[in-house]
Curated annotation (Swiss-Prot):
The active site is at 37 (proton donor). Its main location: cytoplasm. Pathway: Cofactor biosynthesis; (R)-pantothenate biosynthesis; (R)-pantothenate from (R)-pantoate and beta-alanine: step 1/1. It catalyses: (R)-pantoate + beta-alanine + ATP = (R)-pantothenate + AMP + diphosphate + H(+). This is Pantothenate synthetase. The gene is panC. The keyword Transcription regulation does not apply.
């Protein structure tokens, strides 16, 4: 496994891979890797000749400076995990390599609508940062496929739209959420939880399941369902942030013709903001 930190060296290897006709898969990450990331790597390995994992804590997508500072950086451990998985390349650039002139005045990629709704409304600029760094990685690495986790449901929808709108010839693969045995979705931010909070954390998944059962039963009193869910979360020790029930295919409000719903949930537990989602097929 080769660790690449500079753009010239990356371009040199990408040119060679293209000349050799290799099928390249990209797994973009911010590091602090867990089993959910490893599932992305496994999916990439099954679909391509060469797997490149990027590890870059992207300052452009953080809406709070304190969150950027405390985000876990575990490059050595990450590389050890990826080496065991027989990943071909790790691209781990410094911030100065990606943004040599700083963030002020930086050209960015914005996906209208999707970047400012739902999660984007509570985290201004976040999705603009995501779409910008992903487009930069696509331009640099020129992958045939790229793997993203379905845990970040809105992010995946945003990437798919950006790829379509910008005419990238890249297959976007969504990989299902990996959960702990108690239902908690794996996330790098779970590291912020204390031992006691970790015991409470699966409550978010349980509340989503309760919402799903109501939707499957035909209940469409969405505001009432959401209010009850928020109350349940608060009683469990969370601080409910945002719960939405949307059309899974458009992320717009549910209509009578919606075939699938997605429950999008975000809640604070101590210093950790946990997000999760669940899709439900609606009775027609």
């Amino acid at each position: 496994m080769l660790i690449i930190e500079t753009l010239p060296l990356l371009r040199q290897h990408i040119r060679r891979l293209r000349q050799e006709g290799k099928r390249v898969a990209l797994v973009p990450t911010m590091g602090n890797l867990h089993d959910g990331h490893m599932k992305l790597v496994d999916e990439a390995k099954a679909r391509a000749d060469v797997v490149i994992v990027s590890i870059f804590v992207n300052p452009m997508q953080f809406d709070r400076p304190d969150d950027l500072v405390r985000y876990p950086r575990t490059l050595q451990e990450d590389c050890e995990k990826l080496n065991k998985r027989k990943v071909d390349y790790v691209f781990a650039p410094a911030v100065e390599e990606i943004y040599p002139h700083g963030l002020e005045g930086q050209t960015y990629v914005d996906v209208p609508g999707l970047s400012t709704m739902l999660e984007g409304a509570s985290r201004p600029g976040h999705f603009r940062g995501v779409s910008t760094i992903v487009s930069k990685l696509f331009n640099l690495i020129q992958p045939d496929i790229a793997c993203f986790g379905e845990k970040d449901f809105q992010q995946l929808a945003l990437i798919r739209k950006m790829v379509a709108d910008m005419s990238y010839d890249i297959e976007i693969v969504g990989v299902p959420i990996i959960r702990a045995k108690d239902g908690l979705a794996l996330s790098s931010r779970n590291a912020y939880l204390t031992a006691e909070q970790r015991k409470i954390a699966p409550g978010l998944y349980n509340v989503m399941n309760s919402i799903a059962e109501k939707l499957i039963a035909g209940n469409r009193e969405l505001q009432e369902i959401i209010a009850i869910a928020e109350q349940e979360l608060n009683e469990k020790g969370f601080r409910a942030d945002d719960i939405q029930i949307r059309d899974a295919d458009t992320l717009q409000e549910l209509t009578e013709t919606s075939k699938r719903a997605v429950i999008l949930a975000a809640a604070w537990l101590g210093q950790a903001r946990l997000i999760d989602n669940q899709s439900v097929t609606l009775a027609q």
